[in-house]
Amino acid sequence: MRERFDRFLHEKNCMTDLLAKLEAKTGVNRSFIALGVIGLVALYLVFGYGASLLCNLIGFGYPAYISMKAIESPNKDDDTQWLTYWVVYGVFSIAEFFSDLFLSWLPFYYMLKCGFLLWCMAPSPANGAEMLYRRIIRPIFLRHESQVDSVVKDVKDKAKETADAISKEVKKATVNLLGDVKKST
């Protein structure tokens, strides 16, 4: 685990470049710097004001950036990985909406939530998002796919009917308004 962490800290990216500069200036090993930052973030998630914002930035910011890079890359495997993350993130967000009133009062909630989101986005083929999707979300989706498709089609048809009716009324009102303007001139 430590070797993987060290390898990760020596990959070429903007974060590791910053760690390398800090390591060179301070003489402190980048592993210790990274662990210190992780510790400070964890403490902030427990005690800090705006912990929910920080947690949501971590759960959204990095995955959004990497998702855009995945879309622009020719490799499609990373697209699937990040689409899976976003499906799990969406399901989690909906579940959290209904339980947030209770969960946000728990000590360590935002640290646990952040840990959960980091586990879901972990750079491994068997990360949390993949496991949750494969074991929970996908079976439920496949079991109810036809009913959901039917509801989506009905809603889409009703929305189209409503949009057409509104468009027709707007056209009629425009014609009447233009007729009234023409009569008054």
UniProtKB/Swiss-Prot annotation:
<dbReference type="GO" id="GO:0071782">
    <property type="term" value="C:endoplasmic reticulum tubular network"/>
</dbReference>
<feature type="transmembrane region" description="Helical">
    <location>
        <begin position="50"/>
        <end position="70"/>
    </location>
</feature>
<feature type="topological domain" description="Lumenal">
    <location>
        <begin position="100"/>
        <end position="101"/>
    </location>
</feature>
<feature type="transmembrane region" description="Helical">
    <location>
        <begin position="102"/>
        <end position="119"/>
    </location>
</feature>
<feature type="topological domain" description="Cytoplasmic">
    <location>
        <begin position="120"/>
        <end position="185"/>
    </location>
</feature>
<keyword id="KW-0703">Sarcoplasmic reticulum</keyword>
<dbReference type="GO" id="GO:0014701">
    <property type="term" value="C:junctional sarcoplasmic reticulum membrane"/>
</dbReference>
<comment type="subunit">
    <text>Monomer (heart including ventricles). Homodimer (atria, kidney, intestine); maybe disulfide-linked. Homotrimer (heart, ventricle, skeletal muscle, liver). Interacts with ATL1. Interacts with ATL2. Interacts with ATL3. Interacts with CKAP4. Interacts with RTN4 (isoforms A and B). Interacts with ZFYVE27.</text>
</comment>
<keyword id="KW-0256">Endoplasmic reticulum</keyword>
<feature type="topological domain" description="Cytoplasmic">
    <location>
        <begin position="1"/>
        <end position="30"/>
    </location>
</feature>
<keyword id="KW-0812">Transmembrane</keyword>
<keyword id="KW-1133">Transmembrane helix</keyword>
<keyword id="KW-0472">Membrane</keyword>
<dbReference type="GO" id="GO:0005783">
    <property type="term" value="C:endoplasmic reticulum"/>
</dbReference>
<comment type="similarity">
    <text>Belongs to the DP1 family.</text>
</comment>
<protein>
    <recommendedName>
        <fullName>Receptor expression-enhancing protein 5</fullName>
    </recommendedName>
</protein>
<feature type="topological domain" description="Cytoplasmic">
    <location>
        <begin position="71"/>
        <end position="80"/>
    </location>
</feature>
<feature type="topological domain" description="Lumenal">
    <location>
        <begin position="48"/>
        <end position="49"/>
    </location>
</feature>
<feature type="region of interest" description="Required for dimerization and maintaining endoplasmic reticulum morphology">
    <location>
        <begin position="110"/>
        <end position="181"/>
    </location>
</feature>
<feature type="transmembrane region" description="Helical">
    <location>
        <begin position="31"/>
        <end position="47"/>
    </location>
</feature>
<dbReference type="GO" id="GO:0033017">
    <property type="term" value="C:sarcoplasmic reticulum membrane"/>
</dbReference>
<dbReference type="Pfam" id="PF03134">
    <property type="entry name" value="TB2_DP1_HVA22"/>
</dbReference>
<dbReference type="InterPro" id="IPR004345">
    <property type="entry name" value="TB2_DP1_HVA22"/>
</dbReference>
<dbReference type="GO" id="GO:0090158">
    <property type="term" value="P:endoplasmic reticulum membrane organization"/>
</dbReference>
<comment type="function">
    <text>Plays an essential role in heart function and development by regulating the organization and function of the sarcoplasmic reticulum in cardiomyocytes.</text>
</comment>
<feature type="transmembrane region" description="Helical">
    <location>
        <begin position="81"/>
        <end position="99"/>
    </location>
</feature>
